């Protein structure tokens, strides 16, 4: 007889503990994301912002009707010429960890070019010059400074 997996009492307590602060964490992450995108939208190295509640998104009006928030996950398409520049940008970030699990308290980054080899860049459903971010609970000015200093590393 298999009754399926169950949580241990300690794991259940940890989950309940985390769920109690989830609305506050999402509110902070979303607010920081909106502020950061306002600061980055006019940066000369940012080609496009991919975030459903950003006015430049093709389905912005629909997102406004259906969503009360979009969280801290967004993508930037950068004005660069080579995948190596994307690597240089991501490596220059000092306060973002390379993403392995979205949704925690720390800010994360993931270069989309890491998903496929260079021979398949043209057939990838996502542009190779796209970088995905998750904004955690750090101070937004601190994160903006980090992104801006990494953008200065680009040609």
Regions from the language model: what does each represent?
Residues 1-73, 77-81, 85-108, 113:
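Active-site C-terminal subdomain of aminotransferase-like
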Residues 25, 107-155:
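PLP-dependent enzyme catalytic core of the Aspartate aminotransferase-like
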